[in-house]
Design a protein with these regions (language model features):
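A structural signal for multi-pass alpha-helical bundles of membrane permease subunits
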Residues: 3-4, 9-277
Length: 277
């Protein structure tokens, strides 16, 4: 009958969904199991399917010596700092590119797109030389500043698309009442695009949190971030996979918590302006 799905089609659909779920969730579950698995059974041959869970790796990561806990705090400082510095520049820039008439607007957007496409390693040596000469190498501020190379272009592209969806008539009515452009931006536009602002901040946070290239050359032992700490488990004497897995679990928690808490804003932000009357 019309409107009814064929049983085979339904089965194939659910099988494909299950395979997709395993493809994306499988590595995460494997890392979690590796973090609580005894090190002697991690890569045993034949594989050990049943084991007694242990928290030794997580204890090493978070408590004794707890280096990764300190590095996670460093990552949090850098990521939050990158977002706080990013928004005051990217939001007005996105508004200007969306509303003001510019001859070179197309080329400016292409320039930002080029920055997004460029590999971060291309900027490592110039930024290292610059930060060393001005005395900021090894500080949180150096990483926060350099991360703007990634976060600001992305945020401008995101926020411009959200601001484009706001009807211009709303701003014109405010201008008739004598409102300046900055009043329109902060009191009218930003409340209307709040879901997009939250989504943009979340993605900028994740970019900064996961970045390992810039902290690799700009951080010191005191300011090293969690991705750099994880690299320390790759040694010439061997690889401690259970410690790497525990550090990876710790690294996954903040982004996962943020996206779970603000999931409704993610849906609203990504579908903002998708339906028009």
């Amino acid at each position: 009958m019309v409107g009814q799905n064929h049983p085979i089609k339904v089965i194939v659909t659910y099988v494909l969904l299950a395979l997709t779920l395993v493809f994306f969730i499988g590595p995460i579950l494997w890392f979690i199991l590796l973090a609580i698995r005894p090190a002697s059974t991690a890569f045993a041959v034949p594989p050990v399917l049943f084991f007694e869970p242990t928290l030794n790796a997580l204890h090493h990561t978070l408590v004794d010596p707890g280096n990764n806990a300190h590095q996670a705090r460093n990552s949090l400082v850098v990521a939050v700092g990158a977002v706080l510095l990013n928004l005051p520049f990217s939001v007005p820039a996105a508004y200007a590119l969306s509303r003001f008439k510019m001859r070179a607007k197309k080329y400016v957007m292409l320039w930002y797109l080029g920055l997004l496409m460029a590999p971060p390693v291309a900027f490592l040596i110039p930024y290292f030389i610059l930060m060393t000469r001005i005395g900021l190498a090894g500080t949180y501020l150096s990483m926060v500043l350099v991360l703007q190379t990634l976060t600001i272009p992305f945020s401008i592209w995101m926020m411009k698309s959200f601001i484009d969806e706001v009807p211009v008539e709303i701003e014109e009515a405010a201008r008739v009442d004598g409102a300046k452009w900055y009043v329109i931006l902060f009191r009218i536009i930003m409340p209307l695009v709040r879901p997009g602002l939250i989504v943009t901040s979340m993605f900028a946070f994740v970019f900064a949190w996961n970045n390992a290239a810039f902290p690799l050359v700009l951080s010191s032992q005191k300011t090293a971030t969690l991705p750099i700490g994880t690299l320390g488990y790759f040694a010439s004497t061997g690889v401690t996979w259970n410690f790497i897995a525990s550090a990876a679990v710790v690294a996954m928690l903040p982004p996962m918590i943020i996206f779970l808490v603000f999931d409704k804003y993610v849906v609203r932000g990504l579908t903002f302006g998708a339906v028009k009357g």
